[in-house]
């Protein structure tokens, strides 16, 4: 009797253990699955939920690596006779969740959120996996290893020569409006792919008439072989001289020769194999490992140091610790992009979020008064334009239009001139930086030619000229950045005076961004309230607008604080005009200071937009005079002669600049 009871207890324990094992096995895969760094997909999405309802390691599953299909067990509804249903799918097969969960399970097949998700069997590296779409691309939910190494999938030809940051770089920025940092990173990665990484595009089909040209990296490889052969000949000639002349056999000359030869070889053709990449021996090139990162990293580092010492307290100062490794240079460009949005009235940057776009803040930055600014227009006045309620609108131009409708044409003209000059100067800095970066990459690409020239007395001048251009292009953006930092400091002081700013940090998935709320200082709050920036913020929020009839149509305009706004804006305009004329010579000043080439001929002129506006105004004036039967300004002989003389002087100055560059090049090429 005791034996029978003992047997029953043993059977019950076995059944319970098998049952527990069958349910506890859900979520197990034959091969380990990739995980995200933040664990977001595995814990907070349907992806992780579906993983926890699939079993492959249970005896009903199949981890056989020799089979060309994948077998898995899909969990059934609680209380079913079987804990899960076994399915066998071949590569390329697809099934919806509703097709796999046919028992009307409210947690899976009957769930309106999950039922239409498609699971597809695909090869994933060396595994065969059940893959589902996610917010971060297709991800495997169950995998098994393959006994044979699968044939490599053909590379995707799309964007094979364009940097990945060109379409994902915005995720590394902390500014809501970002384009300059994206442009810099996109160009940097693209140049690296074109010049050094090689052509990753697959070859054309045999029937195609398109012929792929050899990649730049292939040509440089051939060039390095030629330079290597020349260095071997150089070593042989030195050995001959040492054997024929005892002066060359001195310890000092031999040591100097060895040091120079190793440095030239390391930075021109590379030494190796010194390391292994992907199991293949690779050469280590000093110019690519140290020279290029140093030259391209010096400009943003110097410029950012200058920017950190400029500007208002707290405005557009992002948390550098939140930038990912390798993308900290975005801090410089985010500061520029942020100010463009702030000066032009991007409401979200002011932390004005009436539409709930930003979400909840996850933190605050240091500085700023704890007392927030008054809640302007809490109920939404009828007098304000509808454009002020749109998220992401540049409200500066809407406010300028409000002044125009009130007849304040001078304020409109001053505001437009300020915005045009400000954007022109920033555009010049961005293009100047990009041109210098392209020059550095080109100089690095042709470095195998110029670096060995340091070995010979007659060609040493060519190496000095090459080195001078590299160093100048690394330092010129820092000089221009100092000018931009001074400009921004003057603008911040003139527009916001002593106002303070409190940073709000937000995070949505992998994207982190910040806003800056204007705060009144603890002392001297009246001065901040009288500033142009504070009053513009009132207009952005809907204060100060009035609605009245113009003939038969209702219009909305601004008639409040017109005199003070005009005075403050004229002060800003004075600074703009001063910097406008100074910006004409900043390029030449930077080139003279760094003893390098002048980049103004290949960059966007800081006065280009203003010059186009002036030409347009002159054209309209001439057209108006012609319509009245009067001779245009261009037809007057004296003025026309002056115009031609000015053009001739401009041409002479340009040719003089070109001659200076030619003299510099000829000086670099000659001996000292």
Swiss-Prot record:
Identification of the protein by name: Uncharacterized protein RF_0090
Localization, UniProt: Cell membrane
Organism the protein comes from: Rickettsia felis (strain ATCC VR-1525 / URRWXCal2)
Gly residues bias (residue ranges): 656-672
Annotated transmembrane regions: 226-246, 254-274, 410-430, 436-456, 469-489, 562-582
GO biological process entries: protein secretion by the type IV secretion system
Signal peptide bounds: 1-24
InterPro entries: Conjugal_tfr_TrbL/VirB6
Keywords on record: Cell membrane, Membrane, Signal, Transmembrane, Transmembrane helix
UniProt biased composition (Basic and acidic residues): 633-647
Family, as annotated: Belongs to the TrbL/VirB6 family.
Stretches the record annotates as Disordered: 626-672
Membrane topology (UniProt): Multi-pass membrane protein
GO CC term (a single one): plasma membrane
A Pfam family reported for this protein in Swiss-Prot or TrEMBL: TrbL
